[in-house]
Amino acid sequence: MTVIALAAGKGTRMKSPLPKVLHPVAGRPMIEKVIQASKQAGAAEVRVIVGHGQNLVRQVVEPMGVACYVQDEQLGTAHAVRCAKPETIEGVVVIMNGDHPLIEASDIKDFVRIFRDEKCDLAVVTAVLKNPGEFGRIVRHKGDLAAIVEAKDASAEALKIREINTGIYIVKASVLSEYLPQISNNNAKKEYYITDLIALCIQDKCRVQAIQSTPKVAVGVNNQLELARATRLLFKRKALRLMEDGVLMIDPRTVYVEESVEIGAGTVIYPNVFIRGRTKIGSFTVIESNAFISDCEIGDSVQIRGGSYLESSKLHNKVSAGPYARLRPETEIFEEAHVGNFVEMKKVKFGKKSKAGHLTYLGDAEIGEEVNVGCGTITCNYAADKKKYKTKIGNRVFVGSDTQFVAPIEVGDDAIIGSGSTITKNVPAKALAVARGKQFIKENYSAKTAETEEKEQV
């Protein structure tokens, strides 16, 4: 089986400089969804027709192992298929649009199976819609496919038909090679339409069939509203699958999980959560409202409190983060550690059972086990030379509130750092380090100040 994906159009109704097929649907370009479904369905080869913005399209699709064929002028769907050199293909050919992101591998497999079982020469996939709109109508005679009539050319009677052409075709390569050159552009737009292939095959009494499918396969994307609808449907599909696998969603309508995300059974997700990228989440984890998680690895029984923002980080089992924690790339939080509210970390290894409860920034740091990091602690990792330096803190260290570590610096095991300190030198194990201005007291100072001010006013 070979798939030809049509992706050369400008997509002018998108009103965007980005080629239409590259617009993201639930996190990935829609053409990528079509290619992925084709490969999962067993396609030996996928040929993508490119044209408008072809360099950008190639950057996305060629790493997926597909071949690109150029349609320099957009002269219709049949012309696009010609550009794929069908005479070099053998077996079964599936033709579909690159802007149908809801197509699944199981759909393609079913279409090809029916095509083969019915010994078809050509088949068109159809669907019955409540509002057929501008879709081409399927005209049947005694149940068999008789013609496809475009909406703009249809009579009032034909417009009442609700069965439509989805734009997906399955055809023998030999039939495609024979009849494709016979398609003319004798129409108002002077374009070559793939639907004319049906008429030619019916005329020559080829075995032509209409395979009726579900409305989802008809969901194409031509404007931003349709893009949003397709995205919503994909998020809904993902949410349903996760819930079937044992994930609890308080309100799945407001949970947005991209297809690439993996989540274990028993995990609870509150409303208004977005999880994307290559994220993997274990079992019995709780993710509270307004959390954003991207490309993270999260273990079992983790607590992610509301408003937390996590990206490219790893959280081991029984970690708690937030509310309003921010974990930036290359951060790793080990078992049973706690990252509290308004704590930000970047490039940090935060040890087992360590705690940073509030209002803290740790960057380019290695923090040992069972460390207590007091409120307002900062690792000063960025120097005037525009280089970043590392802070290393050993096990069981107590860091008092409002401490600054001026990197590069190391603190040994079991050390104590006094509150309000600016630490600029290494601290040995078990040592006490205090670096702050000496406190002094002036007795009755406020009373004397008030008396002076009163005299000045007189």
From Swiss-Prot:
Binds 1 Mg(2+) ion per subunit. Residues 225-245 are annotated as: Linker. The active site is at H358. InterPro entries: Bifunctional_GlmU, GlmU-like, GlmU_C_LbH, Hexapep, MobA-like_NTP_Trfase, Nucleotide-diphossugar_trans, Trimer_LpxA-like_sf. Its cofactor is Mg(2+). Signal peptide: none annotated. Residues 246-458 are annotated as: N-acetyltransferase. It catalyses: alpha-D-glucosamine 1-phosphate + acetyl-CoA = N-acetyl-alpha-D-glucosamine 1-phosphate + CoA + H(+); N-acetyl-alpha-D-glucosamine 1-phosphate + UTP + H(+) = UDP-N-acetyl-alpha-D-glucosamine + diphosphate. Pfam families: Hexapep (PF00132), NTP_transf_3 (PF12804). SUPFAM superfamilies: Nucleotide-diphospho-sugar transferases, Trimeric LpxA-like enzymes. The keyword Cytoplasm applies. Pathway: Nucleotide-sugar biosynthesis; UDP-N-acetyl-alpha-D-glucosamine biosynthesis; N-acetyl-alpha-D-glucosamine 1-phosphate from alpha-D-glucosamine 6-phosphate (route II): step 2/2; Nucleotide-sugar biosynthesis; UDP-N-acetyl-alpha-D-glucosamine biosynthesis; UDP-N-acetyl-alpha-D-glucosamine from N-acetyl-alpha-D-glucosamine 1-phosphate: step 1/1; Bacterial outer membrane biogenesis; LPS lipid A biosynthesis. In the N-terminal section; belongs to the N-acetylglucosamine-1-phosphate uridyltransferase family. Homotrimer. This is Bifunctional protein GlmU. The lineage of its organism: Bacteria, Pseudomonadati, Bdellovibrionota, Bdellovibrionia, Bdellovibrionales. The gene is glmU.
